[in-house]
Amino acid sequence: TTIAETERWERLADELRNFHDVARFLRPSPGDVPRIDGLDLACLTLPLHDVVGGDHLAWVDFDRRYDLDARIAEAEKQERTEVSRNLRRLRKRAGVLVADASGHRVTDALVAAMLHQAFLLGVNYELDLFGEVTTHLFDNLNTRFYKTTAVNKFFTMIYGEISEGGKLRFLSAGHPPPAVFAREFGRFMKISE
């Protein structure tokens, strides 16, 4: 090999290490798991190849991530009572997005990273408009990703919100239904739509 080829491979390896760092940053840390009274929330992702791949998880602790107090005050100032009421409900809810981009390559991790940022930004706007996450967000994500990714790139996702009483509401976009541990029955149970 020539010196130029060696330098090119070193730059490529450096870029891959850099991408690994970015992908690692997007993975939730234990401190990111929201706290909901009366519930134990946990999740685990095991990427096929190190940290890079198409599997993705994003927790949504509405209060910590989106400053509900400021949003509620703004909604009340604008006399948007329904938005204010919806925002107050989020204090007792947590959200989780699980997505799976097709494949286990660096490009699939890139699609997952794009989805991560688009999702969190979309939630930000949804809270301003409606005071909660609605199906509009997922319609928009689907449309945008369909128009901007290659034909052979796709993802499935499921978004759920769990409240203090243990009630789970979820939306699935081609993703298998969730499984939850039911203390009453002492086992994991699949939830049907």
Task: Indicate where each model-derived feature is located.
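… and, occasionally, acidic/histidine-rich disordered N-termini of signaling adaptors
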Residues: 5-193
